[in-house]
Amino acid sequence: MAENKNQARAGGPGHGPGRGHGYQRPQNLRGTVGKLLGYIGRYKGALIVVAVCLVLSSVGSVAGSYFLKPALNYIAAGNFTGLFWMLVAMGGVFLVSAGCSYAYSRLMVRISQRTVATLRQDLFNRLQTLPLRYFDTHQSGDLMSRFTNDMDTVSDMIGNSFASVVSNLITFVCTVFMLVYLNWALTLITFVFLGLMLLVVKSVGGRSRVSFQQQQAALGSLNGYIEEMIEGQKVIKVFHHEQKTLDEFSARNSAYRDAAAMAQTYAGAMMPAMGNLSRINYAVTCCVGGLLSISGVFDIGSLGAYLLYVKQVSQPVGQISQQVNTLLAEVAGAERIFAVMDADPETDDGTATLVRVLKDGDTLTETDRRTGHWAWKKSDGSLTELRGDVRFEHVDFGYDPEKTVLHDVSLFAEPGQKIAFVGSTGAGKTTITNLINRFYDIQSGVITYDGIDVRDIRKDSLRRSLGIVLQDTHLFTGTVADNIRYGKLDATDEEVRAAARLANADTFIRHLPQGYDTVITGDGGSLSQGERQLLAIARAAVSDPPVLILDEATSSIDTRTEKLIEKGMDSLMAGRTVFVIAHRLSTVRNAQAILVLEQGRIIERGDHAALMAQKGKYYQLCTGQEELS
């Protein structure tokens, strides 16, 4: 594997905030909300309608209750006609309120889905621009969670939580206004109990939040351990560590049980406390209001309406408390998404591009036709023939700027040469090939390609000129032909088949159920490792590159299969500059130059015969005195 794989990965399990209280709050609330508003603000017309419906719905639900005052007074006076029309008016107001509530809910769901779809697309687009270094330091599961869990929380926030908080705030303010309007003195009692409710929310809610955070941490630890143990079952059984695994699981399971019990205890205490305070408030208000009614300060209708508002006023308080915590957790999910989108993209200051040319002697002419000849077109319009001359001059590099893994590396590969890198794992072999295609940029020195500094070549053109077979073969969901064509998207069916024959993959492909049209799923899980590697080699062959990089290309192929592809590989490598990294020294014996690396330095160079005669590191590797990896 590439040497950078041993770098520490940051990010943790990172499964994104959910809908509970226990997740981290956003670090930059204002900035994250501002970015979200930038997305939501694209639907200004719909948002205006939502705002109007939201206000009408909340005000209507409060105003409708006021009709209880005249209704009760009509009953006391025996005016049933007036009562009838008052009930009709009340029903009409509640009907309008319900209609507005339905309308803004539907609109917010639509806005939410469109916003999240745009956000998801922008996030995916950003991932395509990030440098490989970013993926070295962020776990794939953590990045996946931003497309799934975090996107779900953003969708819920826009479609539900935000509108609910605003609606409850409007309802609370309107209800308090009606209480003061009906009897400001009696409202003082309600204010006392509202203050007590806020104290409960602050005290119990704060402890509940901490407990939920501990619960989620324990759950993450438990889930991570389960996943690790499932994947490592073979090792566990080989070393007879079943009991140790069970003991560790029991400890983590107990920790999660205790944390969950504490979290649920606090969560369960919140609503009963709020409910009891609300009922006490209602009882006290009934008694005092009854006395005021008897003394003539209150009529029966005002008392009835007031008591109804007292019942209503405590509901928004508890709901707002819960929704604000949820909303903050959901904003934290959005913040995780924007953290990826704000990451610095892969920079590309190159200007030279790869173009097709007609070659007439030493004269090159740019063309759109397929000629089989390519050239580098510089910013001044001059053309330099693409030949495959690659040179390293005093190159230093480290994945971590403070830790150098390549030291003063100098090498050259002339067009058509085969250069082999050998050495123990971590010596720097794969790192060199990563620098050729500019997956990373060097700290010092220079790398040239046909005499041009690779930093002056556009990355897409540079990588288009390289055929790469990586150690880790990845196949995409699609047909066999599509996976080979990934090396050259406009390749014809005949070019695909020719590449497969060159890699000796044609025989096994034709024995598949649908041949080249056989659909591959699950990263080619139905194919053997050798077959998957053959497809990767065919993918490189179809692009017909002048420079070929084989990173442990035959490491996953058995000896018999390796012999089958040697002839095809020789044809593929003919006339090309080839860089080879291999576990098997037999695959590098015919290289024009073999470079032996140790701890990021080239310690030996020469052909097979010369290096064997030196009886140094290469000799030890060949004779088995040292392991190649």
Predicted regions and their residues:
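Short intracellular "coupling" helices and adjacent cytoplasmic loop segments at the cytosolic face
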Residues: 15-24, 113, 121-145, 149-151, ...
